[in-house]
């Protein structure tokens, strides 16, 4: 399998508010930058979406080192929160509906397709790729005319 590095970040100007996501993919000396945004969204939704979009951009199953500053996303996968949520009918330990279920459902088959290792990086600490992703995500969040995130409430 090909080895790919993916760096991701999400940004929200207000929470909820206009938000942006970014993913930078690196493979064999090439780099691809992706980004987008929505109005009326949250930072956590943009963080998850950045991971989804990065993984969806891969044309075949890959071994992925995924770098994120989102403990929420990383913990949901590595601490098996996703597994627990599924077993519990998409309810948290407190029996409340899991937020962002629509995005988690999009992420699950991507995690099954690729071999993904999550790496946490401290945000806003000078990590070059994280800073690049932050710039791209903020740029998208700052644009006018963003489509609404119609699933943001769920």
UniProtKB/Swiss-Prot annotation:
UniProt xrefs under PANTHER family: RIBONUCLEASE H1
The protein's assembly and partners: Monomer.
Entry binding sites for Mg(2+) 1: 9, 47, 69
Listed name of the protein: Ribonuclease H
InterPro entries cross-referenced by the UniProt entry: RNase_H (IPR050092), RNaseH-like_sf (IPR012337), RNaseH_domain (IPR002156), RNaseH_sf (IPR036397), RNaseHI (IPR022892)
Top-level lineage group: Bacteria
Any Pfam family hit: RNase_H
Cofactor comment: Binds 1 Mg(2+) ion per subunit. May bind a second metal ion at a regulatory site, or after substrate binding.
Gene3D superfamilies: Ribonuclease H-like superfamily/Ribonuclease H (3.30.420.10)
UniProt similarity note: Belongs to the RNase H family.
Cellular component, GO, one term: cytoplasm
Organism from which the protein derives: Oleidesulfovibrio alaskensis (strain ATCC BAA-1058 / DSM 17464 / G20)
Residues holding Mg(2+) 2: 9, 134
Top-level EC class as recorded in UniProt: hydrolase
Gene transcribed to yield this protein: rnhA
Functional summary from the UniProt entry: Endonuclease that specifically degrades the RNA of RNA-DNA hybrids.
GO BP: DNA replication, removal of RNA primer
Reactions listed under catalytic activity: Endonucleolytic cleavage to 5'-phosphomonoester
Subcellular compartments: Cytoplasm
Keywords, comma-separated and alphabetical: Cytoplasm, Endonuclease, Hydrolase, Magnesium, Metal-binding, Nuclease
EC number: 3.1.26.4
One annotated GO molecular function: RNA-DNA hybrid ribonuclease activity
Cofactor dependency: Mg(2+)
Domain RNase H type-1, first and last residues per copy: 1-142
Predominant localisation class: cytoplasm
């Amino acid at each position: 399998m090909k080895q790919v590095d993916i760096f991701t970040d999400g940004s929200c100007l207000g929470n909820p508010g206009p938000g942006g996501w970014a993913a930078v993919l690196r493979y064999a000396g090439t780099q691809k930058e992706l980004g987008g945004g929505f109005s009326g969204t949250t930072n956590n939704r943009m963080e998850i979406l950045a991971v989804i979009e990065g993984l969806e951009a891969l044309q075949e199953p890959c071994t992925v080192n995924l770098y994120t500053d989102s403990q929420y996303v990383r913990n949901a996968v590595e601490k098996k929160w996703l597994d627990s949520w599924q077993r519990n009918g998409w309810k948290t330990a407190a029996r409340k509906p899991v937020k962002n279920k629509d995005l988690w459902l999009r992420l699950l088959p991507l995690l099954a397709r690729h071999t993904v290792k999550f790496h946490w990086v401290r945000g806003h600490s000078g990590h070059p790729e994280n800073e690049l992703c932050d710039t791209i995500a903020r740029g998208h969040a700052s644009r006018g005319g963003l489509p609404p995130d119609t699933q943001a409430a769920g």
